[in-house]
């Protein structure tokens, strides 16, 4: 209701509104979740995971996607249909994460509780619950939540990163090393982690390192034009104009292909 009245919405509220309006119009509509996206917020050595969702609408044999942030979200895989209950759970999970990022753990707690009640097997929800407990001064509960997340999803990078930070901060070097190795195995296969590392290198002026990470990202996934745009910028900073132009040509080709797929 607020999103409709103010004409302002994030991806979740926009999707909830779209699905509700489609149902009112007699259309088959559902939420869709995108995995493996660049949608983490890092702060104070803590990782909050934000999921991206959009709306799917079925009209006869046609399947349409309505996405408020299609141009901004990076994802390798197509969206996955989810239930209305899971969609609402994601709303509460993301709202809790937003409040945590704004340093409001007391306000985040009821949203987190509802999210976990609606989706008790959602690993990233438990990882975010761990952040909440840590903000509330309960590292033992945070550890339990992170481990619960990993029991549900052994490759959950957010839970792994937060566990590594937790053990580092409390001086448990043995456990820190165990989970750091697990995290490294996950990250080395993640093109978007490599992309974020490249962006960080570029911001610091370490353009040779940025090139290495952009190229690793591309080896893992060759379908995102933004990898090539970043690579071109880094090459230009190094004075390698021929390589930069080649990267930009590839970025342009991928952008045209993506635009053609949406039309």
PLM-predicted stretches and their roles:
Residues 108, 142, 175-176, 210, ...:
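Single-residue signature of alpha-solenoid repeat helices
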Residues 125, 159, 193, 227, ...:
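TPR alpha-solenoid repeat register
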Residues 16-86:
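Hydrophobic/aromatic-rich core segments of domains that either
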Residues 120, 154, 188-189, 222, ...:
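Short coil turns that delineate tetratricopeptide repeat
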